[in-house]
Every structure is written in C-alpha cells, then in structure tokens.
Amino acid sequence: IEQFEDAPRSQPNLDSLRILVDVSRNGEMKHLRFQTANDHAQVFTEIDVDISENGHYNLHTIDFGAKLSRTDIEIKLSAEQASTKINGLAVTNGSQYHDTHLAVEHRVGDTQSAMTFRNMVDGKGEATFNGRVLIEKNAQRSATEQSVGNLLLSKTARVNPKPELEIYADDVTASHGCTVGSLNQNELFYLKSR
C-alpha cells in the first residue's frame, strides 16, 4: 500500500516519486496507491514495472489531491503467461489538473493486460488519460482490454481521453472503449445529496 499525503501548505511545493517493480517468475504483486497531496502541490510520479514468466501485477490507483498531478506508468510483459490488471480513478475539482499516462508492452506471446480508468471532473478541473497498449510482432496469442470512462460534473470541466492500441501480431484478442458523459441537474443534485 502506497499512500501519498502532504501537510497543508500555503506555498506551492514539488514532489517527485519513482517506483521500480520487478515481478519475478511466478510472483504476484498487488499495488494500492492513494494520492491525496495538498492543494498547492505539484506531484510527479513514475512507476516502472517488469513482469517475468507467470508473474502477475495488479495496480489500483486513486488520485484526489494536488494542484497538478502527473503519473507515468510503464509496464512490460517480458515473459509468457505474464499479466497485469490496472484500475484507476482520478477525482478532479476546482482548478486541479490530473494527467495519467499508462503504457503496457506485450513483448512476448501468451500475455494478458486489462486496464480500466475513470475520471470524475468538477469545477474548472481538467483530466487527461493516455492509455497505450503495444503488442509486438512476436507476441502472438496476447490479450488486452482497455476501458476509459469520463464523467463531467460541471460545464467548465474538461477531459482529454486517448486510448491507443498498437498491434503488430496477427493472433491477438484486443478491445478498447472510451466514453465521456455528464449528468443533468436532477442527477447531479441526487449524487451530491447522498
């Protein structure tokens, strides 16, 4: 479990984090990440993951805080039967900006990845999600799923979703989808009153 908090401050501050994960053969890692930095913080996070044979990496990431948050996640499926599952949520309000870049590389065959990411944006907030899956030519029988959902809670909120699939192999299973929606006044009132 990784929990990032900042003490309340009146001045801007910069935080930079780098996380390196190596999932060994037959290994499994469950990574829970919570980012609740103060309203003035600028938080830059880089997560690099390499997964070996029959290794599994599951990431659940939630971003609430920071004036500016940039998260770069790079996952390499380096051996057969390696898999990853990523679930993410960014809740943005005021004038916050949350920017998430996620890249998954299927380097060999018989690998699996699934990513589900959600943005909820209110006020003048803005959220960007760039999810890229690369399936190399020799990564036959790989499977990937990608789902990006965005909910705008105000007329001034903005989202920039960009799901990408780059496939060079012939024998793969791949799907991706992206939605952007908003709520009417009654739905928004109901949601905020609960």
Spans of model-derived segments:
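Conserved beta-strand/loop scaffold segments within soluble protein domains that form the structured core
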Residues: I1-F189, S193-R194
